[in-house]
From Swiss-Prot:
Possible endonuclease which induces a single-strand cut and initiates DNA replication. It is an enzyme of class 3 (hydrolase). It comes from the Bacteria. This is Probable replication endonuclease from prophage-like region. Belongs to the phage GPA family. The keyword Hydrolase applies. The lineage of its organism: Bacteria, Pseudomonadati, Pseudomonadota, Gammaproteobacteria, Enterobacterales. Keywords: DNA replication, Endonuclease, Hydrolase, Nuclease. Its EC number is 3.1.-.-. InterPro entries: Replication_gene_A-like.
Length: 809
């Protein structure tokens, strides 16, 4: 049978049949695919495939358009400083946190994440923390290193974030959202120049607020004082957003029940201050230093293990401030209308600004209280009051305190002041009275605590002590249990062990200049009390803490004015008989004589005695307004002299009006002092050393002789040096600079590797490089200048700081 459309092949038969197998298109054998030899088969285009491709292209274009629009909107509203820089920073912080989380998941090492978080902090936080981390890592103890990161560094970073949140409020962030004020958010990271520029912008913003307020309120030419006060209120509200109290705020603010009329004359000077860039610079710089110090407390950089009482940065700033003040005093003098001049440095050193004079006056006052207590038969009790644990940032071992609530040093001081005020009110209600002195000093982490030396009747001692203990431990009472010693201590002073003055002498000295405490070691910090006096002074200046306060006695300012009056009278009277009366009234003259003799006990009794209200004191300080207005247009108050309610008129003790002027400088001497840096003149501008060498050659040629000071004894050398002129002293100082001091190369202290690492770490923590050159210099008996005339030296495996370092050699 013939088949025309099919191809026949020989195929095996089935069931004995001879029929041939027919091959159809659907079962034709396929050819093997070789992608290297055969060309790629292209699918045939169809209407459906073309439609799908068009839809895909439209979707891609729409997605690109939406992304572009989203980026434009995001950049317009969030990445534009003129819109909302705060939101931009929040978004950046969120992205950074996401990146950190991703890295943490990838690395799976929490220690590296902690180190990365530390590195992301500002330099004043990250640098000292990284130095500590590096030191712990160099010890080679992996478990202790990891435990230090997790138990110390991580809580420190968490506390740092809480402190920052408490510092920057919502209103403060709102102020930072204005044009040019973004720097307020990073105020603790700024230096002094940056704060000056920021203060200029803040003053400009206040000026614009005042212009806007005047435009809204002053609708007519006849402006009323109340409308001016409302304009002041708007500017003051802007200042309050920055957590700065406006000047004269209490007198000018709105009150429901005002007893006195509104002092509208205080509005112009208040506005002048709020519109002044210099005034804002002082306020912002003070805020910057306080915020920065609280951040350093949060990361445990202020404690006895690192820097007691206050950070090293604050100590260095205080030294620099003192150095600038000394330079200012030395370059100025005081002159009066008659042409008489006084050296300003001598005047400052002779005043109560001198720490030695301030210490002597307080010790004399305490001695006077002691004599009065003996005369009255009163007993003396020594109290110590401490803040609750929520005010303490660091434990005694240097680790973070888990109970700390981000309370500042200033808040701890305010807590003690409020507690003392409440106790005094309750004591007066019960008819109990006392008098004495209190000393405010810091713990190792900067928290304030008080020491009180109080005199009272013996029958009232138990009642006063119980009442004071009640108020001292009433907050957070549950954390004390049965032991109230950590919060309150009282000790009845036993005359057999020591006098009340001897009890308080150490606390007065170590909070002023450390005089007489060179060998005393602090039980809290383990350091000499004399070395810690500088830290305490910087702490009190930074946090504005009043260190000393006398209560229950007449004021000491009247005592100073009486002594000044006695000195003036002695100069006027000349050779008048000693003991002659100065004042006509015998009662007032007795007070003046007691003050002139320096006997506080007699002075207090002649004034009326202890526990006497101020209105009954015989002599009080008189004040008056300044003749010349200040830079802000107001007349400040200054001391006039003394006055008494039993006598008419006032006695002036400041009759002379003194002006401070810059000292006149001799141009030739100034040029000679500057040497090669002197400006071009017609004289010789060679360096000073060359001039001196030439002068010595001329003297030798003329046959002149040079005095040999090496053969003089101490008295002859003293007389010779004090008889030299200023020019001869400068020449001698220049010759001494040319002579290189001899070094003892054979002397070197031997220390272990661990002590070497500790020395390097402590040098770096104080702001030095900690290089081998510095370490070798210290080990060979040398010293490194640290500012304000002090030097650092290494003795007995301890780094010390003193201006008498050669005495330790």
């Amino acid at each position: 049978m013939a088949v025309s459309k099919f191809t026949l092949h020989n195929a095996p038969t089935t069931g004995g049949s001879n029929e041939a197998a027919v091959v159809f298109p659907w079962n034709t054998p396929k050819k093997a695919v070789n992608p290297y030899l055969d060309p790629a088969e292209v699918a045939p285009e169809s209407a459906l495939s073309n439609l799908i491709a068009l839809y895909a292209a439209d979707n891609e274009q729409e997605q690109l358009r939406r992304e572009t629009l989203s980026d434009e909107v995001w950049e317009r509203y969030f990445f534009n400083e003129s819109r909302d820089p705060v939101q931009r920073e929040i978004e950046q912080d969120r992205l950074i946190s996401h990146a950190k989380t991703a890295r943490e998941q990838q690395r799976f090492n929490p220690d590296l994440v902690i180190i990365a978080d530390v590195g992301a902090q500002p330099a004043h936080i990250s640098k000292p923390l990284l130095e500590r981390i590096k030191y712990f890592h160099s010890l080679g103890r992996a478990k202790a290193y990891s435990r230090y990161l997790r138990e110390t560094i991580r809580p420190c970073l968490e506390r740092l974030e809480r402190v920052r949140d408490s510092q920057v409020s919502a209103s403060f962030r709102f102020m930072a959202s204005h044009d040019g004020l973004e720097g307020l958010l990073v105020l603790p990271e700024m230096n002094q120049d940056q704060v000056k520029r920021l203060s200029t912008l803040v003053a400009a913003h206040m000026s614009m607020c005042l212009d806007a307020a005047c435009g809204d309120l002053f609708v007519s030419d006849d402006v009323k004082p109340e409308e001016i006060r409302q304009a002041w209120e708007r500017v003051a509200a802007e200042a309050m957003r920055l957590e700065v109290i406006p000047p004269a705020f209490e007198q000018l603010r709105r009150k429901k029940r005002r007893r006195k009329p509104v002092p509208y004359e205080l509005i112009p000077p208040s506005l002048a201050r709020m519109l002044c860039a210099d005034w804002w610079c002082r306020k912002l710089w003070q805020m910057r230093c306080e915020w920065r110090e609280e951040q350093l407390r949060a990361v445990c950089l202020v404690n006895k293990k690192a820097s007691p009482y206050v950070s090293y940065e604050a100590v260095i700033h205080k030294r620099e401030q003192r150095r600038k003040s000394l330079e200012f005093f030395r370059s100025h003098e005081l002159i009066n209308e008659d042409g008489d001049t006084l050296d300003m440095e001598d005047v400052v050193n002779a005043s109560n600004s001198n720490p030695a004079h301030r210490r002597n006056e307080m010790m004399a006052c305490v001695k006077g209280l002691e004599l009065i207590a003996e005369m009255r038969g009163d007993c003396a009790v020594f109290y110590t009051i401490t803040c609750p644990s929520r005010f303490h940032a660091t434990l005694n071992n240097g680790r973070p305190n888990p109970k700390w609530t981000s309370a500042t040093v200033r808040q701890s001081s305010d807590y003690l002041v409020d507690t003392f005020a409440a106790f005094r009110k309750a004591m007066h209600k019960t008819g109990l009275r006392w008098y004495g002195v209190r000393v405010a000093e810091p713990h190792h982490d900067g928290t304030v605590h008080w020491h009180l030396l109080c005199f009272m009747r013996k029958k009232d001692r138990r009642s006063i002590t119980a009442l004071l203990r009640k108020f001292a431990i009433r907050e957070d009472r549950e954390e004390l249990g049965t032991n109230t010693g950590p919060r309150f201590k009282s000790e009845l002073i036993n005359p057999r062990k020591g006098t009340p003055t001897s009890y308080i002498a150490k606390y007065i000295s170590k909070n002023i200049d450390g005089r007489g405490l060179a060998k005393e070691i602090s039980k809290e910090t383990g350091r000499p009390l004399r070395d810690s006096a500088e830290h305490v002074s910087a702490w009190a200046s930074l946090h504005r803490v009043q260190q000393f306060r006398f209560f229950g006695i007449p004021g000491r300012q009247a005592y100073r004015e009486l002594r000044l009056l006695a000195g003036q009278a002695a100069r006027v009277q000349g050779e008048r008989k000693a003991g002659a009366p100065v004042l006509d009234n015998p009662r007032l003259d007795a007070v003046l004589a007691a003050a002139d003799a320096g006997c506080f006990a007699t002075y207090i009794m002649k004034q009326g005695g202890v526990l006497v209200p101020r209105k009954h004191h015989l002599v009080r300080t008189a004040y008056e307004l300044n003749d010349e207005p200040s830079a802000y247009g107001d007349h400040g108050i200054r001391i006039y002299g003394i006055w008494s309610p039993i006598a008419e008129g006032k006695i002036c003790t400041h009759a002379m009006k003194w002006k401070k002027v810059r000292k006149a400088v001799d141009v030739q001497e100034a040029a000679a002092d500057q040497g090669a840096c002197a400006p071009w003149t017609r004289g010789n501008n060679c360096p000073l050393a060359e001039n001196l060498n030439q002068q010595e050659k001329d003297k030798s040629a003329d046959g002149g002789t040079r005095t040999d000071i090496t053969r003089m004894d101490d008295k002859e050398l003293h007389d010779y040096l004090y008889s030299m002129s200023k020019k001869d002293r400068r020449e001698l100082a220049a010759r001494l600079r040319l002579v290189k001091p001899k070094r003892r190369k054979d002397y070197k202290q031997r220390i272990t590797d661990h002590q070497h690492q500790q020395l390097v770490y402590e040098l770096k923590s104080r702001g030095f490089d900690g290089s081998e050159k510095e370490v070798d210099l210290l080990l060979r008996g040398g010293s490194i200048p640290s500012g304000a005339g002090l030097r650092i030296f290494y003795r007995n495996q301890r780094l010390k700081e003193d201006d008498k370092w050669r005495n330790q050699y």
